[in-house]
């Protein structure tokens, strides 16, 4: 996926009210960006970081600029727009860049399923194969080269794991897919130190037949693509 038009660069002043961030451009202008990330954004929003943002041509938007990427002061590139996790995963599936998810003839998005009436991110189908249910999570929390999810307690994420276990019990294929959107991450684990219940459920889900995949994106201000499978340790 290529950014078109190209992203613009600025320096982060502060993120606040969860959805807003003030930046200063190279020519000295101060702008307020929309921040499309409701998480803690630990390590992704330090004042002084380089920010890459897009600009919408929708004149009705109060904040036409959207924060897309951070380049930390240590040099790591991080995609902070959580919407890209699903977009990049869909692109990779359609391009058959994810070997574990190749060979299907149909891809559907936002399909209702399960006893808790969730919506699965993607459902893959093919003749003579079980349906494949895929839940996507964006990974941006890093400690050294270790990636973690979640970055805050997530009851919604816990619900998704319960739903996937039910799918696997019914004989369908269930996959939790971690889209790693941080250039410094080389391996993935659940964030037991943040959400112990989620980590416990993820281990239980694997034991009950839910597949766990983690793929890392190549990230730049020019574009992004999921490319590399990462090791997962529970």
UniProtKB/Swiss-Prot annotation:
GO terms for molecular function: DNA binding. InterPro entries: SfsA (IPR005224), SfsA_C (IPR040452), SfsA_N (IPR041465). Coiled coil: none annotated. CDD domains: SfsA-like_bacterial. Keywords: DNA-binding. Residues 201-220 bind DNA. Transmembrane segments: none annotated. Belongs to the SfsA family. Binds to DNA non-specifically. Could be a regulatory factor involved in maltose metabolism. NCBIfam families: sfsA. This is Sugar fermentation stimulation protein A. It comes from Escherichia coli O17:K52:H18 (strain UMN026 / ExPEC). The lineage of its organism: Bacteria, Pseudomonadati, Pseudomonadota, Gammaproteobacteria, Enterobacterales.
């Amino acid at each position: 996926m290529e950014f078109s038009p190209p992203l613009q660069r600025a320096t982060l002043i502060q993120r606040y009210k969860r959805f807003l961030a003030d930046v200063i451009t190279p020519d000295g202008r101060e702008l307020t960006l929309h921040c499309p990330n409701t998480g803690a954004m630990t390590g992704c929003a330090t004042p002084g970081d380089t920010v890459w943002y897009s600009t919408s041509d929708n004149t009705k938007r109060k904040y036409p600029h959207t924060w897309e990427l951070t380049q930390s002061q240590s040099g790591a590139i991080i995609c902070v727009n959580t919407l890209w996790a699903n977009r990049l995963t869909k692109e990779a599936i359609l391009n058959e860049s994810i070997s574990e998810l190749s060979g299907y003839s149909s891809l559907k998005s936002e399909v209702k399923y399960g006893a808790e009436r969730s919506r699965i991110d993607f459902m893959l189908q093919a003749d003579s194969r079980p349906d494949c249910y895929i839940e996507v999570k964006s990974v941006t929390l890093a400690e050294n080269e270790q990636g973690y999810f979640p970055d805050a307690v997530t009851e919604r994420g816990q619900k998704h794991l319960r739903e996937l276990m039910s799918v696997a019990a019914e004989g369908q294929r269930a996959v939790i897919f971690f889209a790693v959107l941080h250039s410094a991450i080389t391996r993935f684990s659940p964030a037991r130190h943040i959400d112990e219940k989620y980590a416990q459920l993820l281990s239980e889900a694997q034991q009950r037949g839910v597949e766990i995949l983690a793929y890392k994106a190549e990230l730049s201000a020019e574009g992004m693509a999921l490319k590399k499978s990462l090791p997962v340790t529970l």
